[in-house]
Amino acid sequence: MARSGKKARRLVVDGQTFLWSLGHSHRALGGGYYEDCCETVVIRLFKARGRLHIVFRQGPDRLVPDGYMMPSGAVGTAEGNVNLHEPGTARALLDAALAQGWQPDDPLVKEIDGWTLFGAAARRHSAAGASD
């Protein structure tokens, strides 16, 4: 049975359970055209109210899926690319956010520009590929 794409996935880190999911948003222009595509990874500590939104917005030299030639969850720059559907990528983003001071038990929603964490995730992705 396939996993539901809408349901949050579990990620256990140092004995703590986090839930994470991936979403896509954009602004519809009409006629089947869209702009301002954005991928958002949402991470939260299990049973906590606060959430972390890691947002990857489209921009110069920043690739975000727009429905044409890029698969869902793929984001990239000249530095590399990552698949936001992969648990290893979610873990790398979580680790980078924690290193920047995100507090998982904070009851507020915090938004972080995903591109500030991208380098750490891309390096981890490259290292994992090299060890395969």
What annotation goes with each model-predicted range?
Residues 23-50:
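Short, surface-exposed, low-complexity cationic segments
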Residues 49-132:
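Acidic, low-complexity intrinsically disordered segments
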Residues 13, 18-20:
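Short, isolated positions in well-ordered beta-strands
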